Amino acid sequence: MDQEQERNISRLWRAFKTVKEMVRDRGYFITQEEIDLSLEDFKAKYCDSMGKPQRKMMSFQSNPTEESIEKFPEMGSLWVEFCDEASVGVKTMKNFVVHITEKNFQTGIFIYQSGITPSANKILPTAAPAVIETFPEASLVVNITHHELVPKHIRLSEAEKKELLKRYRLKESQLPRIQRMDPVALYLGLKRGEVIKIIRKSETSGRYASYRICL
């Protein structure tokens, strides 16, 4: 196996670990063992005898934890798929959407290598009420939420959001905003109208919280 292939496998392994962490951070059940998968075990499990990654085998389903269902009763199961094809066309995306809708997944996460054609992107809304999210592999090689400058973000339930607005006598329009395309919003799968609590460290008061609404 040449160095370039080794590098690519290492990047894919890191992206796979980030996806597992992302799914866990959204409140789905992922074991620590899955996240701690070593590079050697990853190769043994997901690469063929020639050392070529078999991305289809990396796909997985995850269900919400009991704690998540208590906080977000409407939360459903999720399906993650890594695409074998370098460029994603209409047929591949149609198959993915059919899988998500037929199996009644609430969320489908589609990880692609280099690009999705505009025609394929137009198919995504047809999965409604399910939500399809797409991520390029390269964006997942590093988990952005692990960066020391990125504070902890926690998604609030509808009840927590109402309590927050009531406590501070605020309207939704008065809350600071976070864009839906913000990297952390994408990581957490935030939807319009949802509020996140951001916990930052402070030199004077230890920790303090601020809130943002997703638009």
UniProtKB/Swiss-Prot annotation:
One of its GO terms (molecular function) is DNA binding. It is found in: Nucleus. SUPFAM superfamilies: Eukaryotic RPB5 N-terminal domain, RPB5-like RNA polymerase subunit. Transmembrane segments: none annotated. Its main location: nucleus. Gene3D superfamilies: RNA polymerase, Rpb5, N-terminal domain, RPB5-like RNA polymerase subunit. InterPro entries: Arch_Rpo5/euc_Rpb5, RNA_pol_Rpb5_N, RNA_pol_Rpb5_N_sf, RNA_pol_subH/Rpb5_C, RNA_pol_subH/Rpb5_CS, RPB5-like_sf. Keywords: DNA-directed RNA polymerase, Nucleus, Transcription. Disulfide bonds: none annotated. GO terms for biological process: transcription by RNA polymerase II; transcription elongation by RNA polymerase I; tRNA transcription by RNA polymerase III. It holds the Pfam family RNA_pol_Rpb5_N. Belongs to the archaeal Rpo5/eukaryotic RPB5 RNA polymerase subunit family. NCBIfam families: PRK09570.1. DNA-dependent RNA polymerase catalyzes the transcription of DNA into RNA using the four ribonucleoside triphosphates as substrates. Common component of RNA polymerases I, II and III which synthesize ribosomal RNA precursors, mRNA precursors and many functional non-coding RNAs, and small RNAs, such as 5S rRNA and tRNAs, respectively. Pol II is the central component of the basal RNA polymerase II transcription machinery. Pols are composed of mobile elements that move relative to each other. Component of the RNA polymerase I (Pol I), RNA polymerase II (Pol II) and RNA polymerase III (Pol III) complexes consisting of at least 14, 12 and 17 subunits, respectively. This is DNA-directed RNA polymerases I, II, and III subunit RPABC1. It comes from Kluyveromyces lactis (strain ATCC 8585 / CBS 2359 / DSM 70799 / NBRC 1267 / NRRL Y-1140 / WM37). The lineage of its organism: Eukaryota, Fungi, Dikarya, Ascomycota, Saccharomycotina.
